[in-house]
Amino acid sequence: MVRWPSETGTPDEASFGPKLAELLREIPYFQKNPDDIAVVDSHGSPMTKNVIAVVRGSGRRTLALAGHFDVVETANYRDLKHLAFEPDALLEALLADLTSRTLAPNEEKALSDFQSGNYIPGRGMLDMKSGVAAGIAVLERFSQQPDREGNLILFATPDEERGSRGMRSLRDALPELAERWGLDIVAGINLDATSDQGDGAEGRAIYRGTIGKQLPFAFVVGQPSHASYPFEGVSAHLIASEIMRAVEANAVLCDTGDGEVSPPPICLEARDFRGGYEVTTPERTWVAFNWLTHSVSPDALFQRFKAVVGEALDRAITHFNVEADRFAKLVGSEANVNHKGRILTTAELREEVRRVGGDAALERIAVLEAELSSSDNPLLITRELVDRMVAEARVTGPTVIIGFGSLVYPHVRMGAETAEEQRFAEALETARLEAERQFDTTIRYREIFAGISDMSFFGHMPDAVDSEVIAANTPAAQFIDRANPKALSYPVVNIGPWGREYHQRLERVYAPYAFTVLPQFLYGIAARFLKP
């Protein structure tokens, strides 16, 4: 599978799904039961596909395994880019390179890893085709059991590295498919990889939950002025910098959950909208933050962001008014110190657009959104849309518009309340202890999978209130997750391979765990959980 290129957003990604389906059809079970493989449309042109394969046993209870097959681009392989999908040749080339020059510390570790014979390089080898391979191995072994109890289903999806459109489209198609196939999906295992720079003790893990991600933005409209007369306007940059100071790396804004603390919010983009030099202060600036969550809801976070931005706006205007008054006294003139700011949510801005420009203005914005839709940069799409909305609504400053700049990834966690959750937890623990004994190793529980992943949408039904808030305050429709109201909900954990430096030139998987321990461990979970 690694030898089949599948970079996100490319025709190779689109062609991977049908290839994978053909590979699965080589398994004897599927030769006898070809209708137990489905290829379901996801998105794009050419159309990318989700691949679904079920091995049936007795009854309706079903355990789902899930992994993504898209990979990030290969440009960082540089001169070895042509070998990125050829693990054997790449290993030989990397060894030749790493033994020919002075190395950085991470390269010294990579050389030692490769010389040990336990690590295999290649784009997608770690993230995450080795996880998909483990799922296939478990599916095939399950199919070989003559008295199978329950059912085992494998999902292989595209687009995890960009917008999880594969998993989200699968989630929406699954209720009808599960009903047609007569399946009750009662639990799931995401197979994504984790990084471990040590001996694997952290990487050999069962993750009970995954981190959430939000990307709130603040679009600042000031009042421009000639640089020689700064107090005839209001500095948009001052307001933006005060927002930056209030939010950037502020540990008070860290989220907590299950005894763990998320990283603080951090700025991903800060800029104004001018393309050239002027001796005029910019009217509009923009800042966008990556904000990771463990427990706070999107609605609650949005209200907190609004409050923090409002306080920052007040401080900036107060400071500007004080300096305007001080300058006026220095030069013996009257000061303009009556500036007052306001906060608009994206939902409120959209209503202003409708009030000022009517349906025609909304249609012009829709045309712009269609023109921008081919971009893979959510911040570019969002800021251009908000910029147009501000113009259509004739918003004057000082005003700050807030909203969500990209797809919201919910944090999710396996509970312990329902009978199926408890049964799943018991199967996980029994299989964990057996794998530790069988392979003389350790497998630990971890609460939060730190990588943004499909796990946010796997077996998870979004909260209705949160969904409404997100939809109303996300300028670009393509970043609004509109789940099928019949979407299935079930407990999910992440158990996958481990390795080092995924997405990098030296991406590598620890093979003994990925190809020996992991498939056996996963099979043990399935066998115990599906037993009546």
Please describe what each predicted stretch is.
Residues 71, 218-225, 293-295, 492-507:
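A glycine-centered beta->alpha junction motif in the catalytic cores
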Residues 175-384:
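Midchain, well-structured core segments that form catalytic/ion-binding scaffolds
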Residues 11, 120-133, 230-237, 512-516:
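Short, conserved micro-motifs enriched in small and acidic residues
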Residues 16-17, 32-37, 325-532:
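An extended, acidic, His-containing surface patch that forms the Zn2+-binding/catalytic region
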Residues 115-209:
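Acidic/histidine-rich catalytic neighborhood of metal-dependent amide-processing enzymes
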Residues 136-144, 242-249, 523-527:
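Short glycine/serine- and small hydrophobic-enriched flexible loop segments
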Residues 1-123, 145-150:
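Acidic/His- and Gly-rich active-site-bordering loop/insert found
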Residues 146-147, 207-213, 277-283, 392-395, ...:
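Short glycine/proline-enriched loop/turn "hinge" motifs that connect secondary-structure elements
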